């Protein structure tokens, strides 16, 4: 079972570090998280090693792990959750409109999109190349969807 409701509220406890799916480190758009599990498994290992060497594996010491991974992907996951939540309520007609916009993306733009890579520079590039997408999103914001 892959969680798709976003990030776990807390991923470190005394003597415990949650990584991957158990930490909510999965992209809700495609329900994929192996990249995050590998990347942050390494971070967890590094933080745990430091904690063990210092003989202090309490939550406060392990919090370095949570701060690092949240800094790296929290905004991506939260953005993807917003897209997913909007998609869940779409009618067939609305899906057709959405897909017609997605079909206009290049392969690289599509990959950035499904990776939830919604950084400012990527969004500006999308707005420049795909004004129809931006107009649609603004309309949805005004409509409240």
Summary of predicted features, one role per range:
Residues 49-145:
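C-terminal helical "tail/cap" subdomain of flavin- and related membrane-associated enzymes
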Residues 1-47, 53, 59-63:
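FAD/FMN-dependent oxidoreductases across multiple families
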């Amino acid at each position: 079972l892959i969680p798709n409701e976003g990030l776990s509220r807390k991923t470190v406890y005394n003597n415990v570090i949650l990584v991957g799916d158990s930490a909510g480190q999965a992209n809700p758009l495609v329900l994929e998280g192996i990249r995050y599990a590998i990347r942050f498994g390494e971070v967890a290992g590094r933080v745990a090693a430091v904690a063990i060497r210092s003989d202090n594996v309490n939550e406060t010491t392990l919090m370095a792990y949570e701060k690092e991974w949240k800094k790296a992907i929290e905004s991506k996951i939260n953005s993807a959750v917003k897209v997913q939540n909007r998609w869940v309520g779409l009618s067939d007609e609305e899906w057709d409109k959405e897909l017609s916009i997605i079909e206009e993306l290049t392969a690289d733009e599509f990959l950035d999109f499904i990776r939830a890579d919604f950084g400012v520079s990527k969004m500006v590039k999308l707005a420049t190349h795909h004004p129809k997408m931006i107009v649609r999103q603004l309309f949805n914001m005004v409509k409240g969807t």
